[in-house]
Amino acid sequence: MDSASKEETLEKLDQEITVNLQKIDSNLSFCFHKITQDIIPHVATYSEICERIMDSTEWLGTMFQETGLVNLQANAAAPVGNAPVKSVVSNNVGIFPTSAEEASRESQTDNGPNEADSAVHVNRDVHSMFTNDSIDDFHTANITSTGQILKLPDSSDEDTGSEAVPSREQTDLTGEGHGGADDEQDESTIQRQSRKRKISLLLQQQYGSSSSMVPSPIVPNKMRKQLAHEEHINNDGDNDDENSNNIESSPLKQGHHHPKGQADDNNEGPDEEESTKEVPKPGTIIHFSTNR
């Protein structure tokens, strides 16, 4: 009984193995047919399309390269009436010649002087069609060589009061005649005077409108030193007043209030006199010496 049961199980296993092998075989055959019948033809068509694209791109590249050698004069010359037509292009040479020498040789041998002139006119007409007339007029306009020579402005340092040295070009231009040099000297003196007037007006406006002692950027060095000294004196006076007020506020120093106030009044007198002497009053005009 045991041997019979074993044989039955072996047969069942053999049958299952054969069934699975048949399934595997059928699947492999299906894959093979799918690859050979569906995938390979599509790949072949795709490769053909790629080859066509490569051929067309190569043809376009050669066409663009040969367009620079097109003989426009041979194609532009047209027959007139019943006149005999000359063989403009030979049988071996197409519309795109192989080299520039052949194109020039064809234009010299095949085309006469009249045909060459007509071709030049045709090319000019085509150029005028694709270009703007206003731009051509702008590029072909008459250019005049005459012009006005501009003078360089006089550069001077306001702090030091130094005058600018004339450049070499101005000296060369003004060295032709003595009269021209005199005129320019007169103009320079007028400019210096006007500049000094402007400085004086600015100083007057500053000291007339505000009471601050901030030096302006156009004030000379001497004025700046005086203003800085006055600011220092005023600041010292303010500090002394603050210290005196602090001392007087204490109860121990109540008895010394009047002498300290008198001393401060006596000390403030000369400072005010010095400030009135050094600071110019509003409305004064400051004159500067000219070093020529």
Curated annotation (Swiss-Prot):
Disulfide bonds: none
Keyword tags: Cell cycle, Cell division, Centromere, Chromosome, Chromosome partition, Cytoplasm, Cytoskeleton, Kinetochore, Microtubule, Mitosis, Nucleus, Phosphoprotein
InterPro entries: DASH_Ask1 (IPR013964)
Cellular location(s): Nucleus; Cytoplasm, Cytoskeleton, Spindle; Chromosome, Centromere, Kinetochore; Chromosome
Region (Disordered): 99-118, 149-194, 226-292
Compositionally biased intervals (Acidic residues): 265-275
Modified residues (Phosphothreonine): 140
Residues bearing the modification Phosphoserine: 26, 118, 134, 155-156, 200, 216, 250
Main location: nucleus
Gene Ontology CC terms, in alphabetical order: cytoplasm; DASH complex; microtubule; mitotic spindle; mitotic spindle pole body
GO process terms (BP): cell division; mitotic sister chromatid biorientation; protein transport along microtubule to mitotic spindle pole body
Oligomer and partners: Component of the DASH complex consisting of ASK1, DAD1, DAD2, DAD3, DAD4, DAM1, DUO1, HSK3, SPC19 and SPC34, with a stoichiometry of one copy of each subunit per complex. Multiple DASH complexes oligomerize to form a ring that encircles spindle microtubules and organizes the rod-like NDC80 complexes of the outer kinetochore. DASH complex oligomerization strengthens microtubule attachments. On cytoplasmic microtubules, DASH complexes appear to form patches instead of rings.
Job description of the protein: Component of the DASH complex that connects microtubules with kinetochores and couples microtubule depolymerisation to chromosome movement; it is involved in retrieving kinetochores to the spindle poles before their re-orientation on the spindle in early mitosis and allows microtubule depolymerization to pull chromosomes apart and resist detachment during anaphase.
Designated name of the protein: DASH complex subunit ASK1
Provenance organism: Saccharomyces cerevisiae (strain YJM789) (Baker's yeast)
